[in-house]
């Protein structure tokens, strides 16, 4: 994948995010960040908000078109399980689904079902910028926005956040 050059965003590393991608998580993670930043003006995002946006954006392809993202894709199973367990309409709007998911993630079983999304994606997305497989090192090194990485990872009162670089609030791809 070749992303257009930018003086604001380090597209050299962003191109590498999507190399060797075997699951859709990184795509939906990035789309979630873009949605929250561009549509809602957020630069500091609760990881659960990004995950909710991921599920909402993948909902229609999975439920309506029955698109499977492959054998190693747990997002597909999580979406179907939520739809069946909570009888969520197939044609629900993204806005209504997002609102519903915000309510549902307050339930322990839903948080447990979706928790796999926050276990790796926030860290693996930053690997092209921060060359380490140690998640703790990724958190530490992201604090200085090493190599111009897109965001830093924070944890406050057991809640994880991403915080975009200050001048990255206008993402010019």
Give the location of each predicted region.
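N-terminal ordered "arm"
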Residues: 5-47
């Amino acid at each position: 994948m070749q992303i257009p050059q930018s003086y604001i965003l380090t597209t050299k590393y962003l191109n590498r995010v999507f190399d060797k991608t075997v699951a859709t998580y990184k795509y939906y993670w990035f789309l979630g960040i873009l949605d929250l930043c561009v549509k809602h003006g957020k630069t500091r995002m609760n990881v659960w908000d990004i995950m909710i946006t991921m599920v909402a954006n993948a909902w229609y392809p999975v439920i309506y078109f029955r698109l499977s993202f492959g054998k190693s894709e747990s997002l597909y199973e999580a979406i179907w399980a939520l739809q069946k367990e909570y009888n969520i309409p197939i044609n629900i709007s993204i806005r209504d689904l997002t609102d519903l998911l915000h309510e549902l993630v307050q339930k322990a079983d839903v948080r447990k079902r979706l928790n796999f999304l926050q276990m790796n994606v926030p860290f693996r997305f930053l690997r092209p910028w921060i060359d380490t497989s140690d998640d703790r090192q990724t958190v530490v090194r992201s604090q200085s926005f090493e190599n111009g990485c897109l965001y830093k990872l924070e944890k406050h009162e057991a809640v994880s956040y991403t915080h975009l670089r200050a001048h990255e609030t206008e993402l010019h791809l």
